[in-house]
Amino acid sequence: MGLKADNWIRKMALERKMIEPFCEANIGKGVVSYGLSSYGYDIRVGREFKIFTNVNSTVVDPKNFVEENVVDFEGDVCIVPANSFALARTIEYFKMPDDVLAICLGKSTYARCGIIVNVTPFEPGFEGHITIEISNTTPLPAKIYANEGIAQVLFLQGDEKCDTTYKDKKGKYQAQTGITLPRILK
């Protein structure tokens, strides 16, 4: 399994629409950087957020998630409360090849501020916007800047194609748009 370089990422984005919209340059002046890098792609966070709240005294249950756990926010800067959590989505829409797995890591700019970004792997055959999990581990409110970088995606190409892709198994988050809350198939 090999880590893919910028020339491969560029080719897949331009010829196969693996990443849309695609930014060929790495933009970093005055913003949290985003775009193509040597061995990855820095994704941007959109303007929509779901911020966790305790206003309704609910319990977070991944098997029975209720909308009252979050409040919707849209804007250029999202303030994540101290020791709190938010969901967001990428600006970019991904179409993963059947022999490629992507792993996403938070950007050091945010990590050095106590903001941890988690994204589960993009499985072969997955298509959709990426839901981003953002944890503010500090005792202070923290800013997240929309339309700027939030994490880096690394692309790993398998030595052979898998038997069953995410699309083949009709994954529950396939073709998601916007921020997708937890789902349990019944």
From Swiss-Prot:
EC number(s) reported in the record: 3.5.4.13
Pathway where it operates: Pyrimidine metabolism; dUMP biosynthesis; dUMP from dCTP (dUTP route): step 1/2
Classification via InterPro entries: dCTP_deaminase, dUTPase-like_sf, dUTPase_trimeric
GO molecular function, one term: dCTP deaminase activity
Gene Ontology terms describing biological process: dUMP biosynthetic process; dUTP biosynthetic process; nucleobase-containing small molecule interconversion
Residues that, per the record, bind dCTP: K107, S108, T109, Y110, A111, R112, Q152, Y166, Q176
Claim: Nucleotide-binding is one of the keywords in the record: yes
PANTHER family associated with the record: DCTP DEAMINASE
Cited function: Catalyzes the deamination of dCTP to dUTP.
Subunit relationships: Homotrimer.
Family: Belongs to the dCTP deaminase family.
Xref: NCBIfam families: dCTP_deam
Protein name: dCTP deaminase
